[in-house]
Amino acid sequence: VRGHVPSNVRSFKFNIFDGQPKVSTLGFHVDPKPFEGKVIATTDEAIVVKTGRAEFAVLDKALVTDVPDEGAKVQVEPYARRRFDGMRADTPEESTEFTADGQPYTVKRLILGSAPAKLPIPEPQCPELQELIHQLEQLPAPDGFRRITHLLVDAGARDFTVVDPSPRNIIATPPAIGFTVASAKFQGRVTVLYERGLDLYAVELHRNSNLVERVDEVSFDELGQALERLIDDGSWRLIRVQRLSGRKLVQH
C-alpha cells in the first residue's frame, strides 16, 4: 500500500475477506456491510481495495465475482446472512407497542450477535414439529457461521408447507416441513420428516413429483450436514464485486 497512504499517516488499517466469518471484539459473529473503494493492486491471489484515507480491504481473488482493472472504483458486497424476506439477518426486529392511552409506537430490538432467520410458517401444534423448527432455526450449519435456516435461505428455499398431525396420527402422517429450493446443486422439493419410531429425521428430495433421493436415520445434530450435502452449492461464499468505473477484465 506504499504510495497510497498520506505521508503524515503513521499506520493504516486493513480488513481481509477470505471467506472466513468475521468476529467482533466481543466474540460475536458479525456480517460485514457493503463498501466502496478503489482497486489499487491485484495479484494472483488477492485484490487490494482502498476504502478510506488509510484503510484497505484485501479480497480473496478466488471468491470475487468480477476482477476489475487497477484504478477502477468498485462496490464490494461480502456475504451477509439473510432472512427469508431478503433482509439482512442482523436487521433490527420491529414491533408495534401501545401506550397506556392506546397510542401505537414502534419498538426496534437488536440482540448483539443475533442474526435470526425464522421460518415463514405458523406456530404448529405438534410438539415434535415445534422442536424441528427450533432445531432448524438454532442449530449451526457445518460452516459454523450460519444457522441451518440461513443455509436454506442461501439455497433459495420458498413455498413452505407443514404437516402438523395430532398426537394419535403422528405415525400415520409424520410431522414434516417441505419447501422448494433452487441451487446449482439441486432444484426441486425438499421435505424433512420426523420418524417417531426411531426419534430421527429423514430428508427427501423430489423433482417433478418423483423421489430423487431419501436419506434416513438423520439425527438432529446431523441435519445441517445432510442438508448441506444435498442442496448447498457454496455460492454464498462469493464476494460480489460491481465496477462503478473502469474496464472489466475477467468475470467468473
What kind of feature is each model-predicted range?
Residues V1-N15, D66, E93:
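Preference for solvent-exposed, low-hydrophobicity sequence contexts
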Residues G3, K13-D44:
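Structural detector for short beta-strands of small beta-barrel domains
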Residues S11-G27, K118-A184:
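Negatively charged, low-complexity tracts enriched in Asp/Glu with abundant Ser/Thr
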Residues I47-T51:
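SH3/SH3-like beta-barrel fold
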Residues G52-V67:
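Beta-strand/loop nucleic-acid-binding surfaces
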Residues D69-T91:
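Flexible glycine-rich surface loops and low-complexity tracts that mediate binding to linear polymers
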Residues E77, F186-F220:
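Intrinsically disordered, low-complexity regulatory segments enriched in Ser/Thr/Pro
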Residues V212-Q251:
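Polybasic, proline/glycine-rich intrinsically disordered low-complexity segments
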